[in-house]
């Protein structure tokens, strides 16, 4: 967006590095065992995935953990790469719903309704009571990307209108 937003992003990244170093942690050991098993071997690989999920919109602001979003558009949120902590941070920032993609199936419910989206049909089949949407149907050739996208969009609207997610049905929120 502008130089100020760029500087906030740089400060956020360097702040994480400084935090890891100050606690004698190796910065580049960040990808979890699950990430590594899925093919993500470096912090750079993991970061590229985050950037891709953001799309091509310009970053409008960088906000601290627990700080609400005040700027329209794409915002970067300061927080660790931990599923539970990240979903809580999103909710604290003002998210009314969390769309959580997973290739391994983290079983949790966040403070806001959390749609868990399986990236593969094997996971969706194994964890039917955890997974709300199977995006693996695209890779399987059962649905086109546009068809699956339309299905997910309808599900998001349904949940926004009161339909419970799998976690909510089990009382986790």
Label each PLM-derived region with a short phrase:
Residues 1-173:
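Anaerobic metallocofactor- and corrinoid-dependent redox/one-carbon enzyme cores
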